[in-house]
């Protein structure tokens, strides 16, 4: 051999392999081959000095200090039970926080349902403008396709045709100003019995 001093034998008692590129353990300062250079592979007695892991709380993401000899899982569990600010069992949040603005209604909802016209907060039952008697502007808003007067409101006493369209007085129907003359002539004809 030309280079008798080249390389070192592995310090692992069961190996003793001659390695030309040995790795020195930074904890115990001994030389090892590629198979035994890790702390676990050669059972390094000083590994605890170098193998330091700081556990992090999964709820609040804060590092938890662990003393030597303590089990990290137990320490993190104690932190969650006692010190953690993000523990879901400690703080009790109200789920139903949005109260209905309709007078006389005491329902609360999980989600905010506000009226696009009056910007009030309402429950599911009163969320539509007609359901909460929305007064945006001077008169109640009526959506297209909705009847302005319900059948129960269109039955004046002494009407010969209950529930008919003639039973509704002209003052209750919202009409475009251009059609006022046509409507009054129809109502006049209805009053005459035509």
From Swiss-Prot:
Alphabetically ordered keywords of this record: Cytoplasm, Metal-binding, Nucleus, Repeat, Zinc, Zinc-finger
Chain residues that bind Zn(2+) 2: 25, 28, 42, 44
Origin superkingdom: Eukaryota
Zn-finger (AN1-type) residues: 4-52, 94-142
Record has Magnesium as a keyword: no
GO cellular component labels: endoplasmic reticulum; nucleus
Positions annotated to bind Zn(2+) 1: 10, 15, 33, 36
Residues that hold Zn(2+) 3 according to the record: 100, 105, 123, 126
Keyword rRNA-binding part of the UniProt annotation: no
GO molecular function: zinc ion binding
Listed GO biological process terms: proteasome-mediated ubiquitin-dependent protein catabolic process; protein targeting to ER
Predominant location: cytoplasm
SMART domains hit by this protein: ZnF_AN1
UniProt-annotated location(s): Cytoplasm; Nucleus
Disordered as annotated region, ranges: 145-164
Annotated binding of Zn(2+) 4, by residue: 115, 118, 132, 134
Pfam family, any one: zf-C2H2_ZFAND2
Protein name: AN1-type zinc finger protein 2A
Originating species: Pongo abelii (Sumatran orangutan)
Gene transcribed to yield this protein: ZFAND2A
